[in-house]
């Protein structure tokens, strides 16, 4: 609970709000949104794609790290990458593909200094303690990620009305 309280305190700050505003700008300037993630992050990508579509910004999700490369038809495509570690090789490989077709990239990650964050035009970090079970299963809270998605979508909804 303490780590969630710390995140929500951070979410009230100027830096976080600037990140949300920049994400909204990238979304409204794009023609197409792709949400990408693997594992738990893939579930967050799917949730985000549905929520963006629900508020009028058509989006698809990719949770298959071997999905084919985007084509030149992806003009003004926005890729939103979800990754707790920010170091998942397959997600990094996908970011390289999207960077190759001049897509804007937003990352939502727990590590603002990660490879994925450095490859992104905008990173929205959430700084929550990682919880890894002995058999290497990540059970870190995804509450901050859901909050970020919903915060962006509420702002998009407000702008449309």
Placement of each model-derived feature along the sequence:
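HTH-adjacent hinge/linker in prokaryotic transcriptional regulators
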Residues: 1-19
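Amphipathic alpha-helical segments that line or abut small-molecule/effector binding pockets
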Residues: 2-5, 21-24, 146, 150
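Glycine-rich phosphate-binding loops that contact phosphosugars or nucleotide phosphates
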Residues: 28-160
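Glycine-rich phosphate/diphosphate-binding loops that line cofactor/substrate pockets in enzymes
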Residues: 18-30
């Amino acid at each position: 609970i303490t780590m969630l309280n710390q995140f929500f305190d951070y979410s009230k700050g100027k830096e976080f709000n600037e990140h949300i505003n920049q994400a909204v700008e990238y979304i409204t300037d794009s023609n197409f949104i792709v949400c990408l993630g693997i594992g738990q992050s893939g579930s967050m990508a799917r949730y985000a794609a549905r929520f963006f579509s629900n508020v009028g910004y058509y989006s698809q999700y990719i949770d298959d790290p071997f999905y084919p490369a985007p084509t030149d038809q992806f003009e003004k495509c926005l890729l939103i990458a979800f990754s707790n570690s920010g170091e998942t090789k397959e997600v990094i490989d996908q970011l390289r593909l999207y960077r190759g077709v001049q897509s804007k990239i937003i990352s939502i990650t727990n590590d603002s200094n990660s490879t994925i964050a450095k490859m992104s035009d905008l990173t929205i970090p959430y700084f929550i303690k990682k919880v890894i079970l002995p058999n290497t299963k990540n059970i870190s809270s995804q509450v901050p990620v859901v909050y970020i998605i919903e915060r962006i979508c509420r702002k998009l909804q407000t702008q449309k009305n």
